[in-house]
Amino acid sequence: IVGYTNAGKSTLLNTLTDAGVLAENRLFATLDPTTRRLSLPGGEPVLLSDTVGFVRRLPHGLVESFKSTLEVATTSDLLVHVVDSTSVDPLGQIDAVHEVLDEIGAGHVPELLVFNKADAAPDEAARLAREHFGSVAIAARTGEGIDLLLRTIGDRMRAITAVVELLVPYDRGDVVAAIHREGEVVSTANEETGMRIRARLASASVGRLSAFVVEGAK
């Protein structure tokens, strides 16, 4: 979850996962990323991480100091970009976030725009969502639009995931646990050299587990 400061990122994470993250109207209220597991409507598990709020013309030195905090964005499969619909310049805030994402090397990560605070500015949130194809208008504080958001995340994640087969040695329970944690296990079979697991995984997970992927498996 990324976005300009005070866009409602922590509130959204709390609404989706009961994470108990501090949600305040002040600069850098969130400094360390909080990650929580969430099951999408189709049953697929995902990991959601909150990040520090971005601001315009963030000094390069400050970007460097926050790089470890922001690094989670560079390894994500999808960026849920939360935008404050009550802002006087929401498009400028979107551009500011994109600038920081480019600077930290996350500009290539697929993005889902989420126009928040529809409870306070319903017409503006709806207008922004109409003008940005594939985006969603929500009110994280009240829960309005959350069901649609979850379905949209599920659709986007399915579009960037693949079913792969992995052969994991029996002494690598940590790898088996990671597959269950990061993806959706379709089937398992015990073989002489290890457990063959067929699972739906995002591209980043496939990369991390590449040593166990069975090439050419159907």
Segments the model singles out, each with a brief description of its role:
Residues 1-14, 18, 88-92, 99-218:
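C-terminal-of-GTPase-core extension/linker across diverse P-loop GTPases
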Residues 30, 34, 60-72, 82-106, ...:
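Conserved catalytic-core segment of NTP-binding enzymes
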Residues 48, 82, 114:
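Generic enzyme active-site microenvironment
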